[in-house]
Regions:
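N-terminal Rossmann NAD(P)H-binding glycine-rich loop of SDR-like oxidoreductase domains
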Residues: 5-27
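SDR active-site strand-loop-helix element
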Residues: 10, 34, 69-73, 112-118
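Conserved glycine-rich Rossmann-like NAD(P)H-binding loop of the short-chain dehydrogenase/reductase
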Residues: 29-37
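Rossmann-fold cofactor-recognition segment
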Residues: 43-56
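NAD(P)H-binding glycine-rich loop region in Rossmannoid oxidoreductase-like domains
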Residues: 53-92, 106, 123
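Short alpha-helix in the Rossmann-fold core of NAD(P)-dependent oxidoreductases
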Residues: 89-97, 113-116, 147-148
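Conserved Rossmann-fold NAD(P)-dependent oxidoreductase catalytic core, especially the SDR/UDP-sugar
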Residues: 98-141
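Active-site Tyr-X1-5-Lys
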Residues: 139-155
């Protein structure tokens, strides 16, 4: 499915994105990564772009020519930071999710995957997917959780 296909992974230097890049490389994909973080001990044969995805033109640029887009980017922080500076997380996430979805659509790609977060759920021992809209994100993840939920609705 991915052999010789152009694949974009946003957040490809992060914990999930990096693993995804390895899987896609093993499948023979041609990978482009978009991230704010400089890659450390990164893969060869991966096209890397250090870009701010809150800027729409950057999203257009990284989406151009892609067959598949995996949007796994997020904002890394401790659970305490969104409580201290909530809008520093909520607004950029809404902006880069919206920008990426629009740029992907405008690029003509036929395949886009948006990843959410466990932060969309309220605290529970066992999280059930059907329960996500019956409750609210925990206080620790309130605005990041809501921004991911909004991304789910957009996607």
């Amino acid at each position: 499915m991915f052999k010789n296909k152009n694949v974009l992974v946003t957040g490809g230097t992060g914990m999930i994105g990096r693993e995804l890049v390895q899987i896609l490389l093993d499948k023979g994909a041609k990978i482009r990564v978009a991230s704010l973080d400089e890659p450390v001990d990164f893969f060869e044969n991966v096209e890397f772009h250090k870009v701010d995805l809150t800027i729409y033109k950057n999203c257009e640029m990284v989406c151009e020519g892609m067959d598949f887009i995996f949007h796994v980017a997020g904002i890394k922080c401790s659970a305490e930071m969104p409580r201290i500076k909530p809008l520093n997380y909520f607004i950029p996430m809404i902006r880069f999710n919206t920008n990426m979805m629009e740029a992907a659509y405008q690029s003509g790609t036929n395949w886009f995957l948006y990843t959410s977060s466990v932060g969309v759920y309220s605290p529970a021992e066992i999280m059930k997917e059907d329960d996500v809209w019956k409750t609210f994100p925990s206080d620790n993840d309130k605005l990041p959780g809501w921004s991911k939920r909004m991304g789910e609705l957009q996607a």
